[in-house]
Amino acid sequence: VVCPGFIDMHVHLREPGHEHKETVATGVAAAVAGGFTAVACMPNTSPVNDDAAITRLILLRAHQAGLARVYPVGAVSKGQAGEQLAEIGELRAAGCVAVSDDGHPVASASLMRRALEYASMFDMPVIDHCEDISLAGDGVAHEGHHAAALGLRGLPAAAEEINVERDVTLSGLTGAP
């Protein structure tokens, strides 16, 4: 099969701060080995990619590796804490293609509304982690017969559906795609 290179829309390159897990260079090398010519890297670094300087560092490391295109995803909120909006315009100017609090839901509807409004001004998508933590709790598998039979704590579908409904409604309210 011959096809164009694939794009992985959700990778964790971990640099800066967690280089013992993965660096930009090792991550893009693995991507290329698997047929991926571009990756979108999530902001869960240390420090979090919520600052233009971190974005520029990631892009510098990607340029130095020279293997695949790297598209940084900046954080929606500072420190991915869900409390204060990150400087989305500065992240865009530095090279971020989207924003996300990857792995952390934006619990505040008000903050998500502002993120959608602000990001749409820069034609940036908001990549959402839809999960109501108060419902999901410490569940590890879809709630149902199989989880119960295996003795696993269940995750109700509503834990995701509630946030999806909220954020689709906010998207309509703000006009953000």
Give residue ranges: language-model regions.
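Alpha-helix-loop-beta-strand connector modules within alpha/beta enzyme cores
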Residues: C3, A52-V73, E117-D128, L173
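Histidine/acidic residue-rich metal-binding segments in metalloenzymes
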Residues: L85-P177
